[in-house]
Amino acid sequence: MEKSVNVIGAGLAGSEAVWQLVNRGVKVDLYEMRPVKQTPAHHTDKFAELVCTNSLRANGLTNAVGVIKEEMRMLDSIIIEAADKASVPAGGALAVDRHEFSGYITDKVKNHPLVTVHTEEVTTIPEGPTIIATGPLTSPALADEIKQLTGEEYLYFYDAAAPIIEKDSIDMDKVYLKSRYDKGEAAYLNCPMSEEEFNAFYEALVTAETAALKEFEKEVFFEGCMPIEVMAKRGIKTMLFGPLKPVGLEDPKTGKRPYAVLQLRQDDAAGTLYNMVGFQTHLKWGEQKRVFGMIPGLENAEIVRYGVMHRNTFINSPTVLEPTYQLKTRNDLFFAGQMTGVEGYVESAASGLAAGINAANFIQEKELVVFPTETAIGSLAHYITSASKKSFQPMNVNFGLFPELETKIRAKQERNEKLAERALNAIKKVAEEL
Protein backbone atom coordinates (compact mmCIF):
# COMPACT_ATOMS: atom_id res chain seq x y z
CA MET A 1 0.00 0.00 0.00
CA GLU A 2 1.27 3.47 -0.88
CA LYS A 3 2.39 5.35 2.21
CA SER A 4 1.01 8.78 3.03
CA VAL A 5 1.84 11.53 5.54
CA ASN A 6 -0.65 13.10 7.95
CA VAL A 7 -0.37 16.88 8.24
CA ILE A 8 -2.30 18.42 11.12
CA GLY A 9 -3.05 22.11 10.62
CA ALA A 10 -3.43 24.08 7.38
CA GLY A 11 -1.80 27.32 8.47
CA LEU A 12 1.36 28.71 6.91
CA ALA A 13 3.60 25.86 8.11
CA GLY A 14 1.13 23.07 7.40
CA SER A 15 0.26 24.34 3.92
CA GLU A 16 3.95 24.68 3.03
CA ALA A 17 4.72 21.20 4.38
CA VAL A 18 1.90 19.72 2.27
CA TRP A 19 3.24 21.46 -0.83
CA GLN A 20 6.77 20.12 -0.32
CA LEU A 21 5.39 16.60 0.19
CA VAL A 22 3.18 16.54 -2.91
CA ASN A 23 5.99 18.06 -5.00
CA ARG A 24 7.93 14.91 -4.11
CA GLY A 25 5.06 12.60 -5.07
CA VAL A 26 3.90 11.86 -1.52
CA LYS A 27 0.20 11.46 -0.69
CA VAL A 28 -1.06 13.68 2.13
CA ASP A 29 -3.98 13.50 4.54
CA LEU A 30 -4.45 17.12 5.64
CA TYR A 31 -6.48 17.77 8.79
CA GLU A 32 -7.89 21.25 9.48
CA MET A 33 -10.56 21.88 12.12
CA ARG A 34 -11.72 25.22 10.71
CA PRO A 35 -14.55 26.10 10.03
CA VAL A 36 -16.09 23.20 12.04
CA LYS A 37 -14.22 24.54 15.07
CA GLN A 38 -12.79 28.06 14.93
CA THR A 39 -9.93 29.53 16.96
CA PRO A 40 -10.36 32.91 18.69
CA ALA A 41 -7.99 34.50 16.13
CA HIS A 42 -9.18 33.10 12.78
CA HIS A 43 -12.10 34.48 10.79
CA THR A 44 -12.24 32.34 7.63
CA ASP A 45 -12.07 28.72 6.49
CA LYS A 46 -9.09 29.46 4.23
CA PHE A 47 -5.69 27.80 4.54
CA ALA A 48 -2.70 29.96 5.55
CA GLU A 49 -4.95 32.72 6.87
CA LEU A 50 -2.93 35.72 8.07
CA VAL A 51 -4.42 36.52 11.46
CA CYS A 52 -2.37 39.62 12.29
CA THR A 53 -0.56 41.95 9.86
CA ASN A 54 -0.61 41.48 6.07
CA SER A 55 3.16 42.09 5.87
CA LEU A 56 5.74 39.34 5.40
CA ARG A 57 8.39 41.94 6.30
CA ALA A 58 11.50 43.03 4.40
CA ASN A 59 12.19 41.74 0.91
CA GLY A 60 15.77 42.96 0.41
CA LEU A 61 18.81 40.75 0.88
CA THR A 62 20.43 43.04 3.45
CA ASN A 63 17.80 41.73 5.86
CA ALA A 64 17.74 38.11 7.13
CA VAL A 65 14.00 37.75 6.53
CA GLY A 66 14.59 38.80 2.92
CA VAL A 67 17.26 36.10 2.64
CA ILE A 68 15.01 33.36 4.04
CA LYS A 69 12.31 34.34 1.53
CA GLU A 70 14.80 34.08 -1.33
CA GLU A 71 15.94 30.66 -0.07
CA MET A 72 12.31 29.55 -0.01
CA ARG A 73 11.77 30.82 -3.57
CA MET A 74 14.69 28.63 -4.64
CA LEU A 75 12.99 25.64 -3.01
CA ASP A 76 9.58 26.23 -4.67
CA SER A 77 7.75 27.52 -1.60
CA ILE A 78 4.01 27.91 -2.18
CA ILE A 79 3.79 30.53 0.58
CA ILE A 80 6.32 32.82 -1.11
CA GLU A 81 4.85 32.08 -4.56
CA ALA A 82 1.42 33.14 -3.24
CA ALA A 83 2.88 36.23 -1.55
CA ASP A 84 4.63 37.33 -4.75
CA LYS A 85 1.39 36.89 -6.72
CA ALA A 86 -0.79 38.67 -4.12
CA SER A 87 1.69 41.44 -3.29
CA VAL A 88 0.57 45.03 -2.71
CA PRO A 89 2.78 48.17 -2.70
CA ALA A 90 4.73 48.34 0.58
CA GLY A 91 8.09 49.98 -0.12
CA GLY A 92 10.90 47.52 0.61
CA ALA A 93 8.58 45.03 2.31
CA LEU A 94 6.54 42.15 0.92
CA ALA A 95 2.92 42.83 1.90
CA VAL A 96 -0.06 40.99 0.46
CA ASP A 97 -3.77 41.16 -0.19
CA ARG A 98 -4.60 38.67 2.56
CA HIS A 99 -7.72 37.25 0.85
CA GLU A 100 -5.98 36.72 -2.48
CA PHE A 101 -2.98 35.22 -0.67
CA SER A 102 -4.87 32.60 1.37
CA GLY A 103 -7.33 31.96 -1.48
CA TYR A 104 -4.47 31.09 -3.85
CA ILE A 105 -2.91 28.65 -1.35
CA THR A 106 -6.26 27.05 -0.46
CA ASP A 107 -7.08 26.49 -4.12
CA LYS A 108 -3.67 24.96 -4.99
CA VAL A 109 -3.50 22.69 -1.93
CA LYS A 110 -7.16 21.57 -1.79
CA ASN A 111 -7.30 20.71 -5.47
CA HIS A 112 -4.02 18.81 -5.68
CA PRO A 113 -4.70 15.16 -6.63
CA LEU A 114 -2.37 13.85 -3.90
CA VAL A 115 -4.14 15.77 -1.10
CA THR A 116 -7.15 14.53 0.87
CA VAL A 117 -8.58 17.23 3.15
CA HIS A 118 -10.32 16.21 6.39
CA THR A 119 -12.34 19.03 7.99
CA GLU A 120 -12.27 17.86 11.59
CA GLU A 121 -10.51 18.46 14.88
CA VAL A 122 -7.67 16.08 15.67
CA THR A 123 -7.55 15.22 19.37
CA THR A 124 -5.11 12.30 19.28
CA ILE A 125 -1.81 12.13 17.42
CA PRO A 126 -2.18 9.54 14.64
CA GLU A 127 0.22 6.67 14.04
CA GLY A 128 2.48 6.73 11.01
CA PRO A 129 4.44 9.63 9.49
CA THR A 130 2.87 12.86 10.76
CA ILE A 131 3.62 16.59 10.81
CA ILE A 132 2.06 18.62 13.62
CA ALA A 133 1.65 22.24 12.53
CA THR A 134 -1.21 23.38 14.74
CA GLY A 135 0.13 26.82 15.60
CA PRO A 136 0.08 29.08 18.65
CA LEU A 137 -3.63 28.45 19.31
CA THR A 138 -3.49 24.65 19.33
CA SER A 139 -6.72 23.18 20.73
CA PRO A 140 -6.57 22.07 24.39
CA ALA A 141 -7.23 18.38 23.58
CA LEU A 142 -4.31 18.14 21.15
CA ALA A 143 -2.10 20.22 23.44
CA ASP A 144 -2.69 17.59 26.14
CA GLU A 145 -1.62 14.85 23.72
CA ILE A 146 1.55 16.78 22.83
CA LYS A 147 2.24 17.35 26.52
CA GLN A 148 2.09 13.60 27.18
CA LEU A 149 4.39 12.94 24.24
CA THR A 150 7.02 15.61 24.98
CA GLY A 151 6.75 15.64 28.76
CA GLU A 152 4.63 17.97 30.90
CA GLU A 153 7.41 20.48 31.50
CA TYR A 154 8.31 20.92 27.82
CA LEU A 155 5.10 22.53 26.53
CA TYR A 156 4.49 26.23 27.14
CA PHE A 157 1.39 28.36 26.73
CA TYR A 158 2.77 31.87 26.54
CA ASP A 159 5.86 33.76 25.49
CA ALA A 160 7.61 35.87 28.06
CA ALA A 161 10.76 36.96 26.33
CA ALA A 162 13.29 39.66 27.08
CA PRO A 163 14.84 41.63 24.19
CA ILE A 164 17.82 40.06 22.42
CA ILE A 165 20.64 42.33 21.27
CA GLU A 166 23.40 42.02 18.69
CA LYS A 167 26.73 42.00 20.54
CA ASP A 168 28.44 44.15 17.89
CA SER A 169 26.03 47.01 18.68
CA ILE A 170 26.87 47.15 22.42
CA ASP A 171 29.28 49.92 23.51
CA MET A 172 31.99 47.74 25.06
CA ASP A 173 33.73 50.78 26.59
CA LYS A 174 30.77 51.21 28.97
CA VAL A 175 30.15 47.59 29.99
CA TYR A 176 32.26 44.97 31.73
CA LEU A 177 32.47 41.18 31.80
CA LYS A 178 31.74 39.63 35.20
CA SER A 179 29.60 37.06 36.99
CA ARG A 180 27.93 37.95 40.31
CA TYR A 181 30.39 37.49 43.21
CA ASP A 182 32.88 36.27 40.53
CA LYS A 183 31.26 32.82 40.66
CA GLY A 184 32.37 30.57 37.79
CA GLU A 185 33.65 32.13 34.60
CA ALA A 186 32.83 35.76 33.78
CA ALA A 187 29.78 35.01 31.67
CA TYR A 188 27.73 38.23 31.73
CA LEU A 189 28.15 41.63 30.18
CA ASN A 190 27.19 44.20 32.81
CA CYS A 191 25.73 47.64 32.14
CA PRO A 192 26.35 49.83 35.22
CA MET A 193 24.03 52.75 36.07
CA SER A 194 24.54 55.70 38.38
CA GLU A 195 21.64 56.80 40.62
CA GLU A 196 20.90 59.66 38.24
CA GLU A 197 20.89 57.35 35.20
CA PHE A 198 18.71 54.83 37.02
CA ASN A 199 16.15 57.46 38.06
CA ALA A 200 15.86 58.79 34.49
CA PHE A 201 15.47 55.22 33.19
CA TYR A 202 12.87 54.42 35.85
CA GLU A 203 10.74 57.46 34.94
CA ALA A 204 10.88 56.58 31.24
CA LEU A 205 9.99 52.94 31.93
CA VAL A 206 6.93 53.54 34.13
CA THR A 207 5.48 56.08 31.69
CA ALA A 208 6.22 54.12 28.49
CA GLU A 209 3.39 52.82 26.30
CA THR A 210 2.56 49.12 26.47
CA ALA A 211 1.24 47.00 23.60
CA ALA A 212 -2.46 46.18 23.59
CA LEU A 213 -3.41 42.58 24.32
CA LYS A 214 -5.53 40.90 21.67
CA GLU A 215 -8.88 39.56 22.87
CA PHE A 216 -7.70 35.94 22.75
CA GLU A 217 -4.60 36.80 24.81
CA LYS A 218 -6.40 38.25 27.83
CA GLU A 219 -5.91 35.02 29.80
CA VAL A 220 -2.10 35.08 29.52
CA PHE A 221 -0.59 34.06 32.86
CA PHE A 222 2.26 36.22 34.10
CA GLU A 223 2.88 34.63 37.52
CA GLY A 224 6.59 34.11 38.06
CA CYS A 225 7.35 36.06 34.91
CA MET A 226 6.33 39.64 35.53
CA PRO A 227 6.88 42.31 32.86
CA ILE A 228 9.68 44.66 33.92
CA GLU A 229 7.39 47.71 33.61
CA VAL A 230 4.83 46.12 35.99
CA MET A 231 7.60 45.34 38.48
CA ALA A 232 8.87 48.93 38.24
CA LYS A 233 5.42 50.33 39.03
CA ARG A 234 5.47 48.49 42.36
CA GLY A 235 8.06 50.95 43.62
CA ILE A 236 11.20 52.79 42.53
CA LYS A 237 13.46 50.37 44.46
CA THR A 238 11.80 47.10 43.35
CA MET A 239 14.08 46.54 40.33
CA LEU A 240 17.14 47.16 42.53
CA PHE A 241 16.27 43.95 44.40
CA GLY A 242 15.44 42.13 41.16
CA PRO A 243 16.93 42.30 37.64
CA LEU A 244 18.98 45.47 38.35
CA LYS A 245 20.49 44.26 41.65
CA PRO A 246 24.10 45.56 41.82
CA VAL A 247 25.31 43.35 44.72
CA GLY A 248 28.40 41.32 43.82
CA LEU A 249 28.88 43.18 40.53
CA GLU A 250 31.53 45.75 41.42
CA ASP A 251 32.94 47.53 38.37
CA PRO A 252 36.52 46.24 37.87
CA LYS A 253 37.52 49.63 36.39
CA THR A 254 36.58 51.57 39.55
CA GLY A 255 36.39 48.81 42.17
CA LYS A 256 33.05 50.32 43.24
CA ARG A 257 29.56 48.91 43.21
CA PRO A 258 27.29 50.76 40.75
CA TYR A 259 23.85 51.99 41.88
CA ALA A 260 22.16 49.53 39.49
CA VAL A 261 23.39 46.93 36.99
CA LEU A 262 21.66 45.31 34.04
CA GLN A 263 23.14 41.94 33.10
CA LEU A 264 23.30 40.70 29.51
CA ARG A 265 23.56 36.93 29.04
CA GLN A 266 24.94 35.17 25.97
CA ASP A 267 22.02 33.79 23.95
CA ASP A 268 23.60 31.74 21.18
CA ALA A 269 26.50 29.33 20.85
CA ALA A 270 28.48 31.73 18.64
CA GLY A 271 28.31 34.54 21.22
CA THR A 272 26.91 37.09 18.77
CA LEU A 273 23.60 37.63 20.61
CA TYR A 274 22.89 38.66 24.22
CA ASN A 275 19.59 38.85 26.10
CA MET A 276 18.59 41.35 28.79
CA VAL A 277 18.28 39.21 31.91
CA GLY A 278 14.90 39.51 33.65
CA PHE A 279 13.61 42.11 31.18
CA GLN A 280 10.57 40.33 29.75
CA THR A 281 8.31 43.16 28.70
CA HIS A 282 5.04 44.15 27.12
CA LEU A 283 6.20 47.59 25.96
CA LYS A 284 5.58 48.66 22.36
CA TRP A 285 8.63 47.96 20.21
CA GLY A 286 9.45 51.63 19.58
CA GLU A 287 9.28 52.24 23.33
CA GLN A 288 11.65 49.33 23.99
CA LYS A 289 14.22 50.87 21.66
CA ARG A 290 13.81 54.32 23.26
CA VAL A 291 13.68 53.32 26.94
CA PHE A 292 16.27 50.53 26.91
CA GLY A 293 18.54 52.78 24.84
CA MET A 294 18.90 54.93 28.00
CA ILE A 295 20.89 52.13 29.68
CA PRO A 296 24.67 52.80 29.48
CA GLY A 297 26.21 50.68 26.72
CA LEU A 298 22.90 50.16 24.90
CA GLU A 299 22.52 53.62 23.37
CA ASN A 300 22.86 52.20 19.83
CA ALA A 301 21.80 48.64 20.58
CA GLU A 302 20.42 46.64 17.66
CA ILE A 303 17.47 44.69 19.06
CA VAL A 304 17.15 41.58 16.87
CA ARG A 305 14.20 40.22 18.82
CA TYR A 306 11.98 42.53 20.84
CA GLY A 307 10.60 41.49 24.20
CA VAL A 308 7.11 40.01 23.98
CA MET A 309 4.49 38.55 26.26
CA HIS A 310 1.68 36.85 24.41
CA ARG A 311 -0.40 33.71 24.06
CA ASN A 312 1.58 31.01 22.31
CA THR A 313 1.79 27.23 22.39
CA PHE A 314 5.30 25.96 21.79
CA ILE A 315 7.54 23.07 22.74
CA ASN A 316 11.03 23.14 24.22
CA SER A 317 12.67 22.35 20.89
CA PRO A 318 16.28 22.20 22.21
CA THR A 319 15.17 19.31 24.43
CA VAL A 320 12.77 17.41 22.18
CA LEU A 321 13.54 18.18 18.50
CA GLU A 322 16.25 17.30 15.99
CA PRO A 323 17.44 19.98 13.48
CA THR A 324 15.39 17.97 10.91
CA TYR A 325 12.23 18.96 12.89
CA GLN A 326 11.79 15.32 13.99
CA LEU A 327 10.81 14.43 17.52
CA LYS A 328 13.81 12.80 19.20
CA THR A 329 11.67 10.07 20.76
CA ARG A 330 9.59 9.25 17.66
CA ASN A 331 11.37 9.62 14.32
CA ASP A 332 8.24 9.54 12.12
CA LEU A 333 6.74 12.54 13.93
CA PHE A 334 7.69 16.05 12.82
CA PHE A 335 6.74 19.46 14.19
CA ALA A 336 6.52 22.68 12.17
CA GLY A 337 5.51 26.31 12.60
CA GLN A 338 5.31 28.50 15.67
CA MET A 339 4.90 25.44 17.85
CA THR A 340 8.63 24.73 17.30
CA GLY A 341 9.68 28.13 18.61
CA VAL A 342 10.16 29.92 15.32
CA GLU A 343 8.50 33.33 15.40
CA GLY A 344 6.77 35.00 12.46
CA TYR A 345 4.84 34.16 9.30
CA VAL A 346 7.85 33.54 7.07
CA GLU A 347 9.80 31.61 9.70
CA SER A 348 6.77 29.36 10.33
CA ALA A 349 6.44 28.63 6.62
CA ALA A 350 10.21 27.96 6.38
CA SER A 351 10.01 25.39 9.16
CA GLY A 352 7.07 23.77 7.34
CA LEU A 353 9.18 23.65 4.19
CA ALA A 354 12.03 21.88 6.03
CA ALA A 355 9.67 19.48 7.84
CA GLY A 356 7.86 18.68 4.58
CA ILE A 357 11.08 17.91 2.71
CA ASN A 358 12.28 15.72 5.57
CA ALA A 359 8.98 13.87 5.99
CA ALA A 360 9.08 13.11 2.23
CA ASN A 361 12.67 11.86 2.51
CA PHE A 362 11.73 9.80 5.57
CA ILE A 363 8.85 8.03 3.79
CA GLN A 364 10.98 7.48 0.67
CA GLU A 365 13.85 6.15 2.81
CA LYS A 366 16.24 8.88 1.71
CA GLU A 367 18.72 10.71 3.90
CA LEU A 368 17.13 13.56 5.85
CA VAL A 369 18.33 17.12 5.28
CA VAL A 370 20.02 19.18 7.98
CA PHE A 371 20.15 22.61 6.34
CA PRO A 372 23.60 24.25 6.64
CA THR A 373 23.82 26.85 9.41
CA GLU A 374 25.12 29.33 6.81
CA THR A 375 21.58 29.39 5.37
CA ALA A 376 18.73 31.32 6.97
CA ILE A 377 16.57 28.17 7.10
CA GLY A 378 19.43 26.21 8.67
CA SER A 379 20.45 28.93 11.13
CA LEU A 380 16.89 29.03 12.49
CA ALA A 381 16.63 25.22 12.75
CA HIS A 382 20.01 25.17 14.49
CA TYR A 383 19.00 27.90 16.94
CA ILE A 384 15.72 26.32 18.04
CA THR A 385 17.39 22.94 18.57
CA SER A 386 20.60 24.13 20.26
CA ALA A 387 19.59 27.21 22.30
CA SER A 388 19.55 27.11 26.10
CA LYS A 389 17.06 24.47 27.25
CA LYS A 390 16.38 26.33 30.48
CA SER A 391 15.54 29.72 28.99
CA PHE A 392 14.33 28.79 25.48
CA GLN A 393 12.07 31.39 23.87
CA PRO A 394 10.77 31.72 20.28
CA MET A 395 12.97 33.54 17.76
CA ASN A 396 12.70 35.45 14.49
CA VAL A 397 15.32 34.88 11.81
CA ASN A 398 18.17 37.42 12.04
CA PHE A 399 21.79 37.68 10.95
CA GLY A 400 22.92 37.20 14.55
CA LEU A 401 21.99 33.51 14.18
CA PHE A 402 24.36 33.03 11.22
CA PRO A 403 27.95 31.84 11.74
CA GLU A 404 30.39 34.75 11.48
CA LEU A 405 32.18 35.41 8.20
CA GLU A 406 35.78 34.22 7.97
CA THR A 407 36.87 37.80 7.34
CA LYS A 408 35.38 40.30 9.78
CA ILE A 409 33.57 43.20 8.08
CA ARG A 410 32.68 46.21 10.22
CA ALA A 411 30.29 47.95 7.79
CA LYS A 412 26.90 46.46 8.58
CA GLN A 413 25.37 46.61 5.09
CA GLU A 414 28.43 45.07 3.45
CA ARG A 415 28.57 42.36 6.13
CA ASN A 416 24.89 41.52 5.62
CA GLU A 417 25.37 41.38 1.84
CA LYS A 418 28.21 38.87 2.28
CA LEU A 419 26.15 36.77 4.73
CA ALA A 420 23.28 36.77 2.21
CA GLU A 421 25.57 35.79 -0.67
CA ARG A 422 27.04 32.91 1.36
CA ALA A 423 23.54 31.75 2.39
CA LEU A 424 22.19 31.70 -1.17
CA ASN A 425 25.25 29.83 -2.47
CA ALA A 426 24.71 27.22 0.25
CA ILE A 427 20.97 26.86 -0.42
CA LYS A 428 21.68 26.48 -4.14
CA LYS A 429 23.76 23.39 -3.33
CA VAL A 430 20.97 22.02 -1.12
CA ALA A 431 18.42 22.57 -3.92
CA GLU A 432 20.66 20.76 -6.42
CA GLU A 433 20.99 17.75 -4.12
CA LEU A 434 17.27 17.40 -3.33
From Swiss-Prot:
GO biological process: tRNA methylation; tRNA wobble uridine modification
Residues that bind FAD: 9-14
Keywords: Cytoplasm, FAD, Flavoprotein, Methyltransferase, NAD, NADP, Transferase, tRNA processing
Necessary cofactors: FAD
Main location: cytoplasm
Pfam families found in the cross-reference section: GIDA
EC number(s) on file: 2.1.1.74
GO molecular function: flavin adenine dinucleotide binding; tRNA (uracil(54)-C5)-methyltransferase activity, 5,10-methylenetetrahydrofolate-dependent
Role noted for this protein: Catalyzes the folate-dependent formation of 5-methyl-uridine at position 54 (M-5-U54) in all tRNAs.
Protein name, entry field: Methylenetetrahydrofolate--tRNA-(uracil-5-)-methyltransferase TrmFO
This protein's encoding gene: trmFO
